[in-house]
Amino acid sequence: MNRTRSDSLAAGGLNWDSLPLRLFAGGNAKFWDPADIDFSRDRADWESLSTMERDWATRLCAEFIAGEEAVTQDIQPFMAAMRAEGRLGDEMYLTQFAFEEAKHTQVFRMWLDAVGITEDLQGYLDDLPAYRQMFYEELPASLDALATDPSPQAQVRASVTYNHVIEGMMALTGYYAWHRICVDRHILPGMQELVRRIGDDERRHMAWGTFTCRRHVAADDANWTVFEDRMNELIPLALQNTDDAFALYDEIPFGLTIEEFQQYAADKGMRRFGTISSARGRPLAEIDVDYTPLHLEDSFADEDRKALAASA
């Protein structure tokens, strides 16, 4: 595609108050280096766990690192879709988004190395059919589709798949599991810091996905149906992944229950409908500077902090 102009040279410059560029600035301000996280105490804590506890936590970590790797590889077409739409601010933010996903892959691998897990972990995913369908089929298919069809409808489907269901349900539920394991027992301080850092990054990722869907729903109400249909298609798959993981164990370690995690995941998924619905009929100019998507993710984080503090 030939370049005909540079948006950064346009009269008035860039709108730094637009949500994508606010997210971009936030990522710059909160930059962190995986090499700065101290994993030195985690090895002893890890070895103090029972064999079943280590197996459960290894599977959880395998799900995370494979997911981070998948998004690092699959997110590129969304950048191209933003370029095709002429949205430089979104394209700038997505370059940061992709970098952060690569960094998340790095830091989970560093943690595995630090606690001495160096064997092939692929088998931990072979037992999770819903996970494999989500990450091996639904995610690449929905994002790859943007390479040939960058339409609003395709963008909404891709955003629902990754930002709302994978990040907004599955990953949030996984972070909650790590908090329950680590905070309740006062163990694995390196993992606690890792999850805190990644969670902060991914709140911005989810906010961008919510913003993107709200933008398209405000522009064309037919996109609300696209959002609803894709959410209703994938939410059962996300909940099935929790069932699959818990079903592998006769006794669930760490005092966790499947009911707690199913309720947690379902709550995070269902509350996203209202935030998208609130954009219907709104002027696009308002949506661009409406920080509701970020406030939603911050409220989820605040609720988790309070719940975990109460259980500690």
From Swiss-Prot:
Record's keyword terms, sorted: Iron, Manganese, Metal-binding, Oxidoreductase
Enzyme class: oxidoreductase
Binding site for Mn(2+): 68, 101, 104
MF GO annotations: metal ion binding; oxidoreductase activity
Keyword Iron: yes
Cross-referenced InterPro entries: Ferritin-like_SF, R2LOX, RNR-like, RNR_small_fam
Annotated residues for binding of Fe cation: 101, 167, 202, 205
GO biological process, one term: deoxyribonucleotide biosynthetic process
Cofactor binding comment, as recorded: Binds 1 Fe cation per subunit.
Essential cofactor(s): Fe cation; Mn(2+)
Residues of the signal peptide: none
Pfam families tied to this protein: Ribonuc_red_sm
3-(O4'-tyrosyl)-valine (Val-Tyr) cross-link site: 71-162
CDD domains per UniProt: RNRR2_Rv0233_like (cd07911)
Subunit structure, interactors included: Homodimer.
Family the entry assigns: Belongs to the ribonucleoside diphosphate reductase small chain family. R2-like ligand binding oxidase subfamily.
Purpose: Probable oxidase that might be involved in lipid metabolism.
The protein's name: R2-like ligand binding oxidase
Species assigned in the record: Mycolicibacterium gilvum (strain PYR-GCK) (Mycobacterium gilvum (strain PYR-GCK))
